[in-house]
């Protein structure tokens, strides 16, 4: 059984969505370092995706060091990789730009965007922070 949720969004790459869901699950602590990651076959069957897509997902996560292949054990979750300080900004730029464009499109202000980011951050960390803004 796949230990993470996947909400397929029409028009977006299934590969990208599965990779994102797996990484989100690792960062949220739902999948912990050392735990066995589902096999390619299990991913394909449970998520109803093509086995080639499932294979690409696992290989990508190994290449990006989110997973490790361990002979005799299978694929296991690795410690989440840390980006160097100089790389973090570059890695975030495209996604931040997309967020800002979408916020502007719907008329959200900077405070709303910051609060949404803080809420999501805290939800993923299992924290509940009460805000005075809402």
Regions found by a protein language model. Name each.
Residues 1-36, 42, 90-94, 100-128, ...:
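Extreme N-terminal segment that seeds HTH/winged-HTH DNA-binding domains in transcriptional regulators
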Residues 11-12, 29-30, 45-47, 68-73:
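Short hydrophobic/aromatic-rich motifs at helix boundaries and adjacent loops
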Residues 78-97:
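A surface-exposed regulatory interaction patch that couples sensing to output
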Residues 37, 66-81:
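Short, Lys/Arg-rich nucleic-acid/phosphate-binding segment
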Residues 47, 81-82, 123-125:
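Short secondary-structure transition/capping segments
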Residues 36-68:
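N-terminal helix-turn-helix
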């Amino acid at each position: 059984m796949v230990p993470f949720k996947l909400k397929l969004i029409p028009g977006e790459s299934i590969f990208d969505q599965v990779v994102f869901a797996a990484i989100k699950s690792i960062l949220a602590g739902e999948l912990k370092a050392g735990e066995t990651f589902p096999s390619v076959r299990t991913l394909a069957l449970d998520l109803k995706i093509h086995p080639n897509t499932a294979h690409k997902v696992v290989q990508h996560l190994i290449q990006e060091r989110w997973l490790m292949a361990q002979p005799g054990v299978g694929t296991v979750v690795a410690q989440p990789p840390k980006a160097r300080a100089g790389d973090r900004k570059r890695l975030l730029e495209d996604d931040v730009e997309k967020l800002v464009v979408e916020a502007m499109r719907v008329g959200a202000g900077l405070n709303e965007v910051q609060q949404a980011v803080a809420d999501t951050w805290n939800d993923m960390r299992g924290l509940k922070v009460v805000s005075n803004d809402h």
